[in-house]
Amino acid sequence: MKRNTWKAVSLVFIAILVMTLFAACGERKNYDTQSNNKARSNTAIDKKQGTKAGETFNLKQGSFVIPEGWKLHEGDSTDDKPFVVPVSYSGEGKLDNISVQYGTNPYSKDDIDSFSHAILLQLNQQISGHEASQILASGFTSKQGYPVLKYEFTVDGDRIVQYYIASDHGHIFVYESNYSGSEDTGRASQSIVDSFKWK
């Protein structure tokens, strides 16, 4: 009887092991497919989007000019979420970067105060439990005439600046990660905000 039980346990163990191996192979194949798709979409960006300083990057909802001294980081960028990095970036270390992305929200651009308070509440929830500074919130009008909300803070020693270029029930989210503390990064993100034009 003990021998039959041992056989059954061994068979179950082997079956689980085989299923795990098949599942792992399937996941790897899926990952490879995703990587190939991302590589193809990044190739498309090279041909139709601006990649260097002074060139225009087009989103579905609008466009912005890549700032002087910066370039498109083609490895991480997509048509919906481009990343720009300093031209001097060699591919190693923690790099300052700026991402640009469209998002939706339930607020009209005339109700910017409610939108501002909602963002502030969300940010405070996100940084709770981290070593973070107080959030400095402000607002201004971009050079193109759009209302912009700006939030500055540090999290775990890293300087973060977020801009929201508001429209009716949507916004362009410009996210500055400034690890070096360089003022150039701040100027670059401000340049993106000021050059952005809605379609």
Kindly give the residue locations of the regions a language model identified.
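N-terminal targeting sequences that direct proteins away from the cytosol to non-cytosolic compartments
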Residues: K2-I16, T20-V84, E176-K199
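Conserved polar/disulfide-associated segments of primarily extracytoplasmic proteins
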Residues: D76-S167, H171
